[in-house]
Amino acid sequence: MLPPASIWQAVLFSGYDSMSSPQNSPVTDPTFSTPPVATRPAGQRLFLIDGYALIYRAFFALISRPLTTARGENTSAAWGVVNFLQRLTSAHKPEYLGWVHDSGLSFRHERYPAYKATREKLTEELQNDFDTGMERICQILEAYRVPVLSLKGYEADDVIGTLARQGAEQGLDVVIVSGDKDFQQLVRNHVWLLNPGRGGPAGVEESWVSVENGAERLGVPPSRVTDYLAMVGDSSDNVPGVKGIGEKTARDLVSEYGDLEAILAAAPSLTKKRPREALLEHAELARLSKELVTIKQDLPMPLELDVLRVKEADHARLRQIFVELEFNTLARALPDTLVAVATALPGAPEAVAETTRPVTYYVTVDRVEQLSAMLQRARTAPYIAIDTQTVTDPDSPQKIDALRSSLVGIGISVAPGEAYYLPLRHRTLQPLQGDFLLGDESGADSTEAAKPRAKRASKQAEPSSIAARAIAAGSPPALNLPSLDDPSMVELRALLEDPAVPKVAQNSKHHMLVLRRAGITLGGLVSDTMLASYVLDPGRRSHGLDLLALEFIDHAMTSQEDLAGKGKQQLAFDLVPVECARDFSCEIADVTWQLEQQFRPQLVTQHTYELYRDVELPLVGVLADVEWEGIQIDRSLFASLKERFARERQRVEQEIYVAAGGEFNINSNPQLREVLFDRLKLPSSKRTSTGPSTDASVLQELAEAGHELPVLLMEYRELSKLESTYIDALPALVNPHTGRLHTSFNQTVAATGRLSSTEPNLQNIPIRRELGRDIRRGFIPRDGSLLLAADYSQIELRLLAHLSNDPAFVAAFKSGGDIHRQTASLIFDVPLDGVTSEMRARAKTINFATIYGQGAHALSRQLKIAHSEAKEFIERYFERFQGVREYLDSSVTYAREHGYVETIFKRRRYIPELRDRNFNVRAFGERTAANSPIQGSAADLIKIAMINIRDRLLAERLVARMLLQVHDELVFEVPLEELEVVTGLVKHEMENAASLSVPLVVDVGSGRNWVETKH
């Protein structure tokens, strides 16, 4: 909603010289051109913006593909307004600025009830999005300190007209910013009309209207615009005009007779019949139309220049809003207001001169004799924050690969604004005859494999990057500390490994693995700011340091691209000059140190600190061990699978061509669309901007309707995906140094608390189909060992029984029988021995549908039954398990009241969707509120089990190691002689990870490959 209107309303906001623009900034866009000399405002300028019209245009400019946040908030209008303001103020730098809004119905509606009545009403969903956008824009304007002006009973046009008149009378040059032709009537000496055009590479140039060119657009001078519009009307506002009078006739009449009354007086003598009769018949309508289009200039509203004067923006508030709206480039571009305190080592400056930049003490420690003082300072700090910088091995297929990287330097922060950089493996690039010369003054080794990469990168590096500018200026030779295994570095190794020295990091698992490869076992980890952010709000779009710094300490980080360039042109970190690397790494460590101060109190206040301390943090080390260990694959099997998959894909291709009636490019959506919907005339239920959709849901729907081709297309897509994702990719990702596959587990991605894995993703290999089982058959143990897999049985249903405490559900699990058979017996009202396989299958589907909040529509599609029958099943289910329904309802109610739900272990998930105006979004929020405690508790359980199992394996000095976590399953590599012991250990720890009202059951199996563990 807009701020409430009063007689004269101005909500203060401001600041333009410091406004920053987004990437591909339109600030220098030609759409804001310099006006012609003859029409240039030369004095003190007052810009009056027709705000509502601009917002409306920005909202609908992206209506087919709106900008949205991760949480679904439509940001199109907000983005358009910010973009516009930045272009306008950067190009024109006004001294005074006002943003003018309508205040609701005006006197024109009373005078003519049909005024604007033809405007199309927005749908409920669009209206909700528009209203939310208006609220955000008011926040943005307030942060910019731009006054929002309106007057009850009048339109923005009247407010602008009144203020423009007063401004011109007081000697100001007034610029009205609008694309509305009505404003041309206000143009006079010292009053201009500026149509802002559109930004972007295909932008429409702005246009200026002044007294010199005021007649160009409409063909009449500004003083006769109302007379002209009185006759032609205005369809956008439903101003009737005079039927039978067109634009040319109206221009001719104005040119010959002048104002409307003179034209009406001359009407009887007009020689042309049509305009004569029209004017005689509709004279009063013409007078009414002129009244409607005439902008008032005499409202009881004084021009208050102190209010309108451009002021400094509230950058902290702007950054907060931009982060919330995910305008991250804009947020980073705002001036930095980070305040830090410098604490110096002996020899540091005693005082730092006052400056607008952050106060920092970032020191390069590149000599062994400096280390002792720095290490002593670190040991006296309450905690230290660490950062590692690396170069990835040339043979790694990944850009960031902790297990195939070499350590270049370490950043250590001991207090806000105080950090130290320890260079270990920097090389030097110096300018030489327009090129860069790779040097090695430091004495550090430079592999032959790295040299060509360095030379190539140096030639292509963007001169705009910090490192490239430093190199071009002539960086000093790189000095490095000895390698970490040198005897002189023993104190540093001791500090990093000492569990008594508290350490924090951002993405600590990465640093842990990097240091392990360098021979260091990181000890004393007490916090990880990325994990802390995740526990505080798992729904946050990103837990990256740059966004956390913006949101929590109002600081814009230097990015890797800022430092070293981007893409293939990016400099490797060991080629970045040490002084640049120091500032970059120290900033990361420094910000991490400060974020820890922010997050720990919040975790305690939120009652999530125990989950963070006892589950998420210990799991970091467990996952690091799992990733370090890796898993072996049978390369010969994958080679044979590649041949088999190729044959299968070719077979399906031929069947597709037969079903389609000819060959076509199966991977081309336009060609596939033509075959499905033009050639075969299949029904289309979903459209995109380019035509009927061919996505998986459409193919599934067509396949269920009995059409052959969609079935084959789905099979083809599955084969292609398995082939590219696993058959081709997995062998290529094997680490040549270990001969094993090392996945990366992500702790901060899934809002439920579940882990995910990437590079490669080993959690989505299908198990129910033979093709997926063939891929799993390629995962094997070392010689003399077996794979052991332990899987929670029906963990989510058991958790639902515990959380709901439904007597029938709890009893079904305590009896130890088949839960789906027992459910079928209850909902179909038959004895256990009378349950058929079909009844059990339906009961199983209903059990899991309950967890995920599926309604009758989704269930009817799954079971392929009528909607009414599915609805009856659900009603019968909840009649038998009333406690389940009460629990699910109470979970949604709790979420509405508190804004979040919790797991058994107090993990929170915030659900803002419950407050959304959109019904579908709210429904999603309700389903999320119902199932998140169940899914999240399952995630917590297996994490606790992983920690306990790892601890026992180490404590009992067993060789067996955990290799994978796949949802509710853990996979181990176990020597034959340890199999019995480890089987019992794993089963015990998983089944006793928590005490529930129903037993936890774990199925354990072993075999010579992953598939055999299930037999």
Q: Whereabouts are the PLM-identified features?
A:
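Non-catalytic nucleic-acid-binding/docking modules located in mid-to-C-terminal regions
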Residues: 12, 20-43, 93-98, 146-147, ...
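Noncatalytic, basic helical substrate-engagement surface that gates or grips nucleic-acid strands
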Residues: 12, 20-22, 26-177, 181-210, ...
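Short hydrophobic beta-strand that contains or immediately precedes a catalytic carboxylate
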Residues: 48-49, 176-178, 384-386, 505, ...
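Short active-site loop/helix that positions an aromatic residue
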Residues: 55-61, 184-189, 393-397, 509-519, ...
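A short, charged helix-loop
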Residues: 202-236, 550-580, 589, 593, ...
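Conserved "right-hand" nucleotidyltransferase catalytic core of DNA-directed polymerases
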Residues: 282-479, 497, 506-508, 516, ...
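Conserved catalytic core of nucleic-acid polymerases
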Residues: 571-574, 621, 628, 735-738, ...
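C-terminal polymerase-core module
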Residues: 647, 651-654, 658-711, 879-927, ...
